[in-house]
């Protein structure tokens, strides 16, 4: 039986699927968990986890529940910022904050996550400011 165009559209991953996949990847990396380990915890291969994270395959509600349990978060975690993201996409380009791709790439890198984890543990605002100044200084010497 041939499927209609609307059926194909419903099954095709969309921006929300990509966002959920991105949040799965972020949380998994935050937990220092491999794709293989997450896959084993939810009963799929690491390739399937990869497809979820890239937004290639949709994550069903039951599977999302399993993922949230394995990653120790509520299912709503994967939808956080979805509304804000959609709203920001609707704004004109002049109103959007443009984050350079290399910054985004660093933030989701292993080193970026380690740095963010360590920095988030520093409670004293003055110490945080000094760390920022130090990193800026070190970066200036690299140029």
UniProtKB/Swiss-Prot annotation:
PROSITE patterns: HTH_CROC1
Pfam entry (one): HTH_3
Keyword DNA-binding listed: yes
Keyword Lipoprotein: no
DNA-binding region positions on the chain: 35-54
A GO MF label: DNA binding
This protein's name: Uncharacterized HTH-type transcriptional regulator y4wC
Source organism per UniProt: Sinorhizobium fredii (strain NBRC 101917 / NGR234)
């Amino acid at each position: 039986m041939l499927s209609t165009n609307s059926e194909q559209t419903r099954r095709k991953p969309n921006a929300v699927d990509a966002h959920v996949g991105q949040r799965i990847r972020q949380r998994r990396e935050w937990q220092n968990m491999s794709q293989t380990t997450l896959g084993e915890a939810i009963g799929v291969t690491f390739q399937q986890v990869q497809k979820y994270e890239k937004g290639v395959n949709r994550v069903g509600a039951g599977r999302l529940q399993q993922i949230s349990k394995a990653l120790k978060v509520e299912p709503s975690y994967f939808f956080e910022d979805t509304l804000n993201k959609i709203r920001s996409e609707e704004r004109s380009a002049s109103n959007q904050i443009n984050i350079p791709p290399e910054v985004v790439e660093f933030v989701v890198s292993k080193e970026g996550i380690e740095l963010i984890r360590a920095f988030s543990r520093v409670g004293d605002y003055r110490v945080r400011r000094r760390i920022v100044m130090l990193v800026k200084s070190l970066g200036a010497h690299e140029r």
